[in-house]
Each structure stands twice: as structure tokens, then as C-alpha cells.
């Protein structure tokens, strides 16, 4: 599912994307005939993922490594300034700013706007290549520990 239409600007710390999919009646995030404002978090997460891919593409020329897969593990301080997104006529502008991190985690702050109107904002944490953090899988023949 790709909700974003274009990247309008980006650098090593920021990305700005645009989307019109919030008005699409077939938007996969719609429920009960509406697209709630909290769905804006998915728009922001997709912008963060695109930012990571763009950074990895620039780095991969030097390192020949495949991009790290990221997992959104936390959103904090989210403030919703509207109830829904599907009734907005203006395009969504999604801005994410990388505010910190290391080789295993990335921290972002994000906002969504429709024109000058702030729709929501918050912070997110992403873990990169989390497969190493997975719990060991139990076999079907091994009884659970009590």
C-alpha cells in the first residue's frame, strides 16, 4: 500500500511528501465510511520509510549494502487537530525530520498539513533490521515453559 504521491523535497534530515489519497473512497485505511485523523500516522511512517530508502540509496553507492528494513515501534506525543482526513479538499503535506538515532534506531518528528492547517503531529521511533531482536521460535513439539 503506497499512500504517498510524490516527494517534494528531502535532505539528510528532512523529507516532505504530498498525497491526495486521503480523498479516495477506496483508501485501504478507511473504516465505516471515513478516514480518521490517526491514519495520518501511516502517512508519516511511509514518508519516514521513503526517507530511509533515499538515504540508503545514496549510501549504498559507497558501501554496497542493502537498505535496512525499519519497523515502527513507537509513536509519542501525537496531537490530532482534526477528527478526519477524508473531508479535506487540499492535498496532504507530510513532513518528517530525523532528530536522532544510531545504527539500530532512528527517531523522527512529523507533521501533516492541508495547506497551512496543521492536522496532526508527533514523534516516532523506528528500529532497523529488527530480525536480530526476535524471540527464538518454539517448535511445535516443545512444550511451553511454566
Specify the residue positions occupied by each region the protein language model found:
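Beta-strand residues in well-ordered beta-sheet regions across diverse protein folds
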Residues: 18, 95, 109-111
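Mixed-charge, glycine-accented linear interaction segment located at domain edges/termini
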Residues: 99-145
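A residue-level detector for short acidic-glycine micro-motifs
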Residues: 6-9, 82, 98-100, 126
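Hydrophobic residues on conserved beta-strands that form the core of alpha/beta folds
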Residues: 4-5, 75, 107, 121
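Hydrophobic beta-strand-centered segment that forms part of the acyl-chain substrate-binding groove
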Residues: 50-95
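Catalytic strand-loop segment that frames the active site of acyl-thioester-processing enzymes
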Residues: 1-36
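Hydrophobic core residues within well-ordered beta-strands of beta-rich domains
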Residues: 1-3, 92, 106
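Compact, glycine-rich, soluble single-domain proteins
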Residues: 31-51, 69-70, 77
Amino acid at each position: 500500500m503506497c499512500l504517498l504521491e510524490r516527494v517534494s523535497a528531502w535532505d539528510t534530515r528532512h523529507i516532505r511528501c504530498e498525497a491526495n489519497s486521503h480523498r479516495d473512497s477506496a483508501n485501504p485505511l478507511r473504516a465505516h465510511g471515513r478516514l480518521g485523523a490517526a491514519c495520518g500516522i501511516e502517512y508519516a511512517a511511509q514518508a519516514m520509510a521513503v526517507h530511509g530508502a533515499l538515504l540508503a540509496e545514496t549510501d549504498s553507492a559507497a558501501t554496497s549494502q542493502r537498505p535496512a528494513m525499519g519497523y515502527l515501534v513507537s509513536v509519542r506525543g501525537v496531537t490530532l487537530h482534526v477528527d478526519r482526513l477524508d473531508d479535506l479538499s487540499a492535498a496532504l503535506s507530510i513532513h518528517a525530520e530525523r532528530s536522532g538515532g544510531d545504527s539500530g534506531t532512528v527517531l523522527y518528528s512529523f507533521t501533516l498539513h492541508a495547506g497551512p492547517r496543521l492536522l496532526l503531529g508527533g514523534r516516532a521511533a523506528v528500529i532497523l533490521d529488527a530480525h536480530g531482536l526476535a524471540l527464538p521460535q518454539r517448535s511445535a513439539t516443545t512444550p511451553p515453559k511454566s
